[in-house]
Amino acid sequence: CGGSIVIENEVIAEVLAEETVPSQPCGEIIDAKGYYLMPGVIDDHVHFRDPGLTHKADIHTESTAAAAGGVTSFMDMPNTTPQTTTLEALNAKFADAATKSIVNYSFYFGATNTNADVLPTLDKSRVCGVKLFMGASTGNMLVDRMEVLRKVFANAGMLIAAHCEEQSIISANTTAFKEK
């Protein structure tokens, strides 16, 4: 099957059946006969480690690698240094990505025992979700108080990506495995 795609200002403007003529004259035609056109991948769980661990990689290097692999959008986790658990840290990440990323991006906001009241203020058109650790976590991102968990689930108003581990079960199973 064949067809054409018209791109204007880096945006797909038209998708046309085989013999359909574009509505406007085209400046450049690329013959892609024999090739496949596929949509870009959205990676909804990345750890770019920026800010804080940029000796490993940063938003620019990781987004460049992502683009080379067909990833057009990423959603970065909040366990960076500093953690993305305040509006200030979140806004700083968005500002940094605006100058570094070569693909589309969004960021998770990390829930803590002390920031559940901030969740309703998050911009749902920019923030992809709330990351919730209910088991062992890095930094202060463990949410282990029932009243806070209720607030997180009631107030988030968006996707909640949760680690629902029970640390006592993990510890018991680890001990049992080591004894075998």
Where are the regions that the model predicts?
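Histidine-rich, glycine-flanked metal-binding segment
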Residues: C1-P39
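Divalent metal-coordination and catalytic microenvironments
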Residues: I5, E10, G34, H45, ...
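Short, glycine/acidic-enriched loop or turn micro-motifs at the edges of active sites
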Residues: A17, V46-F48, E166
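Alpha-helical transmembrane segments and their juxtamembrane interfaces
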Residues: E19, L53-A57, M141, N173
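Receiver (REC) domain switch-region micro-motif
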Residues: I29, I42, V130
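Metal-associated gating/positioning segment near the N- to mid-region
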Residues: K33-K100
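Histidine/acidic-residue-rich, glycine-tolerant segments that coordinate divalent metal ions
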Residues: T80-N91, A95-K180
